[in-house]
Amino acid sequence: MSSSSASQPSHDQLATKAQAWSALFSEPMSDLVKRYTSSVFFDKRLWQADIAGSLAHAEMLAAQGIISAQDHADIQKGMAQITQEIASGAFEWKLDLEDVHLNIEARLTQLVGDAGKRLHTGRSRNDQVATDVRLWLRGEIDLIEGLLSELQLSLVEVAEQNVEVILPGFTHLQVAQPVSFAHHLLAYVEMFARDAERMRDVRRRVNVLPLGSAALAGTTYPLDRERVAKTLGMEGVCQNSLDGVSDRDFAIEFTAAASLCMVHVSRLSEELIIWMSQNFGFIKIADRFTTGSSIMPQKKNPDVPELARGKTGRVVGHLMGLITLMKGQPLAYNKDNQEDKEPLFDTVDTLKDTLRIFAEMIGGQMNPATGCKDGGITVNAEAMRAAALKGYATATDLADYLVKKGLPFRDAHETVAHAVKAAVSHSVDLSELPLAVLQGFHPAIEKDVFDALSLQGSLNARNTLGGTAPAQVRTQLARHRARLSA
């Protein structure tokens, strides 16, 4: 058990008590080993999945004639009471019972007697925990997909208001070409859309039933595994019992998808941090997402995006931990796999919290009085435009203009470099150089060059699929609106 577990066991929970498996052993487990090997204080969050799996298993056992109808009814009644106790906080989690499974089974047996002891027929904790984690993760993936949709909608809403706002596009963090601010935001919508696709794809492989694999070799009881899978809404059953109980590739795959999603959040965070700095001043974020300084009264720090950037390393670290956890394990189940839960749980918690916060930080919060969102990012269009002009963002447009006049691109590139040098020496934008000066660099330049050199002209000219022209951006906005509304 991790030393960072939120709840520490009380002294009476450590009282020596027979374990569910202890009949073979000549001495009780030491308190230190109990603490070290117990997982109940973090895996208890699996209780709903554990009860759902047990109820489906019991229903199948009764249908197959392995337990009686009365035992089945008693198990259902006992599980209903346990559900109420856990939900209300009245359930007593005990360290001696090691994990969520044995805690629930022990309470069930206390409530309904022998029927509770019969529930574990045909299964092991090995296939039970693999089932629980899959059921739990399936539900969390569904929540994450919804949160990804909310974040995409927030970005789309801000983009819709800023189609004509011109942002300097950067390469190497140097001004490159002008782009629509909406176009820039939609790049992140594309990333988060792929993240959602990955989550859906992972879900298919998560949503498979290990239960019935038993400890490792299957079971001698006539279980109907497909019936249990159908009851639990799973798409099929694990076809190899050794694989079903031992592999955690589904957890690794989810954490990889979560890591990619957090990397996208981190890239967005970096840009928000840069944009809101005094040196850029492109945006402001609402005060509730910033903090002050204990010594410098003028500071308004972007702690939320900074923390998201930092938490990305945390999630990527969990991915590396899970991969390392699995790499040396022989078949089948090993106790190492107990260490899959804390990184998996923390990855889910971190990702969900981050997506929720970013959706509100970017798009704002619904105001019931107005029916509109308040408090999203505030855009400084003038600062963006000034930065684009200062960086000679239309230099490529001048080169393209000369190519259309018949120059080879490399010659046009060199000609424009000389023009930029002249503009820099006079502290003006290319569009502010007189026509006569521009013609000195090449006689093919005519008055229409100023259409190409304007920021708006540069935007409008990039009217190919996926380009930054406002017409293209509006088409993409409509596509995303339709997709997210479906």
Curated annotation (Swiss-Prot):
Q: According to its UniProt record, where is this protein located? A: Cytoplasm
Its keywords, alphabetically, are: Amino-acid biosynthesis, Arginine biosynthesis, Cytoplasm, Lyase
Taxonomically, the superkingdom here is Bacteria
Recorded catalytic reaction(s): these are: 2-(N(omega)-L-arginino)succinate = fumarate + L-arginine
Q: Does the keyword Metal-binding apply?
A: no
The record's PROSITE patterns line, in alphabetical order, gives: FUMARATE_LYASES (PS00163)
EC code(s) of this entry: 4.3.2.1
Q: Which cysteines are joined by disulfide bonds?
A: none
Please give a single GO biological process term from the UniProt record. L-arginine biosynthetic process
Q: Which CDD domains match?
A: Argininosuccinate_lyase
- Would you tell me the Gene Ontology cellular component terms? cytosol
This protein's major location comes to cytoplasm
> Could you say which protein family the record assigns here?
Belongs to the lyase 1 family. Argininosuccinate lyase subfamily.
Q: By what name is this protein known? A: Argininosuccinate lyase
UniProt source species: Acidovorax ebreus (strain TPSY)
Q: What is the lineage of its organism?
A: Bacteria, Pseudomonadati, Pseudomonadota, Betaproteobacteria, Burkholderiales
